[in-house]
C-alpha cells in the first residue's frame, strides 16, 4: 500500500496490523493541533511513497484512546514499528532524518515482502528480531566477516585459521525457534557438523564448545545448505530463546576454511509485545509519569 492510511477507531487498529503481515508497519501516533506532528507530516507522507514495501499508518491519540493507552503513548509524535503484529521498535520526535534512518535500518533486515512459501503458516523469518550489536563471531576472517551472512547477496562469512566458527546471535526479545536456514556453497566449504546452544550466561570458547552438551546437534547435508533448504529444530527445546550460540565444527569437504552464505531462524516471538516497553504505568489522560 502506498500512502499513509489513517486508522479511524480502536477496533480498526489490529486488522490493519494483521493486513501488513510480515511487512514492516510504521505507525505514527499524532494529535490534532500538535505542532511537531504537523511539521513532520509531509516527510512522513513522502516516506510512505518512497518505501512502498512498508505499510504506513496514522493514529490520532484522541480518536483511538484505547490504542494509544495499550501502546503506552505519552508524547506525540511517536512512531512505533511492527512486524507480524509484534512491536519491534519505536522512535519519538519530529526529526525526519532520524525517522528515515530508523525505517531504512529495519528495511535492511527485511526478509522480503514476498513471504517464503517454505515457511509454515503461523511462523516468520526472525531476522528483524536479531540484535546485531549483541552478536559475536570467533575465528571470522577480516575480509569476510559475520555481517555478510545476515544479508542475501553474494557476500559470505568465512572462517580464518581453520574450519571452525563460534557464532553468538542475540535477539531483541524472547523468541520460539521452529527451524533455521543455513546456506553455504557447494564447493565443500559449507558447514556440516553444528552444535547449537541457547541462553548461555556468558560467551564460551572453542574448548568449552567442543566438550559441552548442546541443546541440539546438527549434521547438515548438501541439500540442507542449498538456498531452499530448511533445517528443523526440536521445537520443544527452543521455547524461550534470548540468544543462540552456533559452534560450526566442520565443513562438507574437510576444506581448510568454512563459508556460510546466509543464515536465519524461523519461529515466532514469545509474546506479541515487548514488555520492556511497558514499564511505565499508564495513568489518566493528562497525567505525566
From Swiss-Prot:
Q: Tell me the residues on which Phosphoserine occurs.
A: 113
Disulphide bonds in the chain: 34-37
- Thioredoxin domain residues are 2-109
Which keywords does the record carry?
Cytoplasm, Disulfide bond, Electron transport, Nucleus, Phosphoprotein, Proteasome, Redox-active center, Transport
Looking at the record, the residues that make up the PITH domain are 115-285
Q: What is its main location?
A: cytoplasm
Q: Which Pfam families match?
A: PITH (PF06201), Thioredoxin (PF00085)
What is one GO cellular-component annotation here?
A: cytoplasm
User: Where does this polypeptide localize?
Assistant: Cytoplasm; Nucleus
**Could you tell me one molecular function GO term of this UniProt entry?**
disulfide oxidoreductase activity
Where do transmembrane segments lie in this chain?
Answer: none
Q: Which InterPro entries match?
A: Galactose-bd-like_sf, PITH_dom, PITH_dom_sf, Thioredoxin-like_sf, Thioredoxin_CS, Thioredoxin_domain
Record Gene3D superfamilies: Glutaredoxin (3.40.30.10), PITH domain (2.60.120.470)
Q: Which SUPFAM superfamilies does the entry mention?
A: Galactose-binding domain-like, Thioredoxin-like
Q: What does this protein do?
A: Active thioredoxin with a redox potential of about -250 mV.
Q: State whether it acts alone or in a complex, and with which partners, per the record.
A: Component of the 19S regulatory cap of the 26S proteasome. Interacts with PSMD14/RPN11. Interacts with, and reduces EEF1A1.
Name recorded for this polypeptide: Thioredoxin-like protein 1
Q: What taxonomic classification does the UniProt entry list for its organism?
A: Eukaryota, Metazoa, Chordata, Craniata, Vertebrata
Amino acid at each position: 500500500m502506498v500512502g499513509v492510511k489513517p486508522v479511524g477507531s480502536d477496533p480498526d487498529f489490529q486488522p490493519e496490523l494483521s493486513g501488513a503481515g510480515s511487512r514492516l508497519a510504521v505507525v505514527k501516533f499524532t494529535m490534532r493541533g500538535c505542532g511537531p506532528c504537523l511539521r513532520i507530516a509531509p516527510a512522513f507522507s513522502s516516506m510512505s511513497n518512497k518505501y512502498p514495501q512498508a505499510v504506513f499508518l496514522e493514529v490520532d491519540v484522541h480518536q483511538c484512546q484505547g490504542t494509544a493507552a495499550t501502546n503506552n503513548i505519552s508524547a506525540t509524535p511517536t512512531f512505533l514499528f511492527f512486524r507480524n503484529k509484534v512491536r519491534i521498535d519505536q522512535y519519538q520526535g519530529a526529526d525526519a532524518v532520524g525517522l528515515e534512518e530508523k525505517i531504512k535500518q529495519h528495511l535492511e533486515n527485511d526478509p522480503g515482502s514476498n513471504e517464503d512459501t517454505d515457511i509454515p503458516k503461523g511462523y516468520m523469518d526472525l531476522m528483524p528480531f536479531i540484535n546485531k550489536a549483541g552478536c559475536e563471531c570467533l575465528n571470522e576472517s577480516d575480509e569476510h566477516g559475520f555481517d555478510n551472512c545476515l544479508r542475501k547477496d553474494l557476500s559470505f562469512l568465512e572462517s580464518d585459521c581453520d574450519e571452525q566458527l563460534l557464532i553468538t546471535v542475540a535477539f531483541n526479545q524472547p523468541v520460539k525457534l521452529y527451524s533455521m536456514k543455513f546456506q553455504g556453497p557447494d564447493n565443500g566449504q559449507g558447514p556440516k557438523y553444528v552444535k547449537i546452544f541457547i541462553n548461555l550466561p556468558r560467551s564460551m570458547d572453542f574448548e568449552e564448545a567442543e566438550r559441552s552438551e548442546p541443546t541440539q546437534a546438527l549434521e547438515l547435508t548438501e541439500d540442507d545448505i542449498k538456498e531452499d533448504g530448511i533445517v528443523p529444530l526440536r521445537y520443544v527445546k527452543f521455547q524461550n530463546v534470548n540468544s543462540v550460540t552456533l559452534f560450526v565444527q566442520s565443513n562438507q569437504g574437510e576444506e581448510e576454511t568454512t563459508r556460510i552464505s546466509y543464515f536465519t531462524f524461523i519461529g515466532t516471538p514469545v509474546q506479541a509485545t515487548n514488555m520492556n516497553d511497558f514499564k511505565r504505568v499508564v495513568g489518566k489522560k493528562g497525567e505525566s509519569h
